[in-house]
Amino acid sequence: MAAKMFYDRDVSLSPIENKLIAIIGYGSQAHAHAQNLRDTGLNVVVGLREGSASRAKAEQAGLRVASIEDATREADVVMLLIPDENQPKVYEESVAPHLTEGKALAFGHGFNVHFGRIKPPAGVDVFLVAPKGPGHMLRRVYADGAGMPGIFAVAQDASGQARDIALAYARGIGCTRAGVLETTFKEETETDLFGEQSVLCGGVTSLIQAGFETLVEAGYQPEIAYFETLHEVKLIVDLIYEKGFEGMRHSISNTAEFGDYVTGPRMVTEQTKAEMKNVLSDIQTGKFAERFIQDAESGFPFMNEQRGKMRDHQLETVGKELRDMMPFISKKELEV
């Protein structure tokens, strides 16, 4: 059975038209949510901690800014869009005391609710809306009159209207222009983490790095290795993004396509897939979440060590030099 997509024609804004929506945070996703909701004609306040460097940015965008406590106290819908590791503390100290019965608590990712790090009270609605793309792109496509696909889920329906509120919110940020799918907090959290770790971030970067190192160790110029293993990834991914595997293979040379079929299975073997299942198991059991939380609470020693190693890697130093020679690469669009 095909999943049902919800579009503008299926969704009414009425469940949130006369409500105040508090966006907690003003980072990559939060700035896009706040501005899109505002431009849809909805009432928005941005909640920021005292002294936040983001206050000026939000005010320059024409948004009203308040403390997290005041924003939560005033709002009917509270969307928590700060980093996962910071959410529980901010929630307990600044949100929970003002999250009275009848309000709605929302998330862009189900991590903290699914793993029990945030436990909302019984009298509030709890939902998530997750656009499937970065914040700067969510804002850009909205401003262009289009939308970004997304997903939504309801974890707690205290009012009997949580699903309608979630869908209305998705419409408010422009996602129903492209279509949204219904999911659960469990499914969103586990599949999102798995995709990031095994394919999108961990898988892709490890594959690129191994390919680059293989060529350089064999005596090839690092600059050539960079082009062949990293730079051209975007060209192929864009084709897959627009046309799928078949369309991509139709667009490349016969030599490249033949090599795809012959060598792909040597790179991603049954052993690789078995390890992917282990990765998924670590996510499902909460093992990954526990490791992430421990590192975060210790000041990220492991993650900072890995960042330092990669910062000094030849792939990064050569890449920076080459990218500086490419005026067609826009640095501004990647800023948050």
UniProtKB/Swiss-Prot annotation:
It is an enzyme of class 1 (oxidoreductase). NADP(+) binds at Y26, G27, S28, Q29, R49, S52, S54, D84, E85, N86, Q87, G135. GO terms for molecular function: ketol-acid reductoisomerase activity; magnesium ion binding; NADP binding. Pathway: Amino-acid biosynthesis; L-isoleucine biosynthesis; L-isoleucine from 2-oxobutanoate: step 2/4; Amino-acid biosynthesis; L-valine biosynthesis; L-valine from pyruvate: step 2/4. PROSITE patterns: KARI_C (PS51851), KARI_N (PS51850). One of its GO terms (biological process) is L-valine biosynthetic process. The active site is at H109. Residues 3-183 form the KARI N-terminal Rossmann domain. Its cofactor is Mg(2+). Mg(2+) 1 binds at D192, E196. InterPro entries: 6-PGluconate_DH-like_C_sf (IPR008927), KARI (IPR013023), KARI_C (IPR000506), KARI_N (IPR013116), KARI_prok (IPR014359), NAD(P)-bd_dom_sf (IPR036291). One of its GO terms (cellular component) is cytosol. Keywords: Amino-acid biosynthesis, Branched-chain amino acid biosynthesis, Magnesium, Metal-binding, NADP, Oxidoreductase. Substrate binds at S253. Residues 184-329 form the KARI C-terminal knotted domain. It catalyses: (2R)-2,3-dihydroxy-3-methylbutanoate + NADP(+) = (2S)-2-acetolactate + NADPH + H(+); (2R,3R)-2,3-dihydroxy-3-methylpentanoate + NADP(+) = (S)-2-ethyl-2-hydroxy-3-oxobutanoate + NADPH + H(+). Binds 2 magnesium ions per subunit. Its EC number is 1.1.1.86. Mg(2+) 2 binds at D192, E228, E232. Belongs to the ketol-acid reductoisomerase family. NCBIfam families: ilvC, PRK05479.1, PRK13403.1. HAMAP family: IlvC. PANTHER family: KETOL-ACID REDUCTOISOMERASE, MITOCHONDRIAL. Involved in the biosynthesis of branched-chain amino acids (BCAA). Catalyzes an alkyl-migration followed by a ketol-acid reduction of (S)-2-acetolactate (S2AL) to yield (R)-2,3-dihydroxy-isovalerate. In the isomerase reaction, S2AL is rearranged via a Mg-dependent methyl migration to produce 3-hydroxy-3-methyl-2-ketobutyrate (HMKB). In the reductase reaction, this 2-ketoacid undergoes a metal-dependent reduction by NADPH to yield (R)-2,3-dihydroxy-isovalerate. This is Ketol-acid reductoisomerase (NADP(+)). It comes from Deinococcus deserti (strain DSM 17065 / CIP 109153 / LMG 22923 / VCD115).
